[in-house]
């Protein structure tokens, strides 16, 4: 039975994460970049200033909502999305990309991220535009909703939209138990045992208790934790990585040269483990880039849709920054840590060690921090992976809610917490492979939705730019539903009146 599952999974995985799936992912990013006038470049300073640049100057970005308001702040939505996005892929995934695709894989990871910014932007724009309130008064949005209500509203596509929405939700629930839970917890337990000799069972019990305290409290409690944990864990890792890279500052030019050389030139087999050339660099760069920032999977839009923002484009800009922070900043630092620490021949791209995964990154950190290097990585993985569990708990909850209703979501949360203990104490090779596939299966219906609604994204973007840049007095495009549009306009009217007085 297990052999059959493994065999079928291998075939499906080869399709969704093979040339066809990766081309669809890259192509969607390119199409959305074109349709929005390459917004990520043309308005670089604007989106940077209105996201991370506004955290300390605009209270609306970070202000907590009222107790009876089920929405969360823009900053909380970003932190919860980054909590799920910045995970083991930023450490283990980058190491695997270099080992399997050579230094050139990092270039293609950047390429995927640059276009993925607009895929993530588009998901968030659609998420806000098609979101609706559930029975508890909480915003619910995501690929399920823009597939059912967006694609489904097109002529002859009603059934297709609904079927794809249900499939996406099913794949998301299954993926949440794998890549969003057990696989992450398994990484934590293994690294804590190797670095500090903490028994896996003890790690599982502690993490299950901590997860229950946060997850069972709902989105606002998850957001309250992630807005504190994510900035600290990111700062912790970035400072550590910068210390290593700057210690090896003389190797930085050669590291970048190896990245560009490997991206476009055939190189010899790496370390006797896996041969690679341009095609392998592209494949592994695209694949690990997608795993790292999740742009195209339709996952983080579920928490972005819970933001108290009115403008779809504003939340879309947070989606751009999310990919930028995850891949361009964190993954690049991990890559430079490995490439500047002497474990890769920068002239040929060959690996000079047989150490793999998180152990390779730990060894790279140990060139500066000594025996504390592996411990630093163990703590980083603990923070990254645990925060991923918190973020994915919300994704799975929203997908489960879409399938079975709001009242059923607590049952999902209880099972999700129980799986934390399972993840810490079991071997999960098949779980890793299956969750990898379910992630890819989430991607396919989501990208169909994004591409089919690319005109809507372009129209919303033009509407925003006309109002904000060109001074045109046009009706804002805030919601696809008249009732929510009027509700948002009613809330905005007193603010406009005060501004004009």
Predicted segment positions?
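Helix-loop-helix module between adjacent transmembrane segments
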Residues: 32-33, 112-137, 148-186, 190-214, ...
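Alpha-helical membrane segments and immediately flanking helix-loop junctions
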Residues: 59-98, 129, 135-151, 173, ...
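Membrane-interface alpha-helices at helix entry/exit sites of multi-pass transporters
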Residues: 62, 67-71, 102-111, 149, ...
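Membrane-interface loop-to-helix entry segments
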Residues: 24-48, 164, 168, 185-192, ...
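N-terminal alpha-helical transmembrane segments of multi-pass membrane transport
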Residues: 1-84, 88, 98-105, 116, ...
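Flexible loop linkers connecting adjacent transmembrane helices
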Residues: 38-72, 96-98, 102-106, 110, ...
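Transmembrane helix-loop junctions in multi-pass membrane proteins
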Residues: 4-5, 35-40, 89-94, 176-189, ...
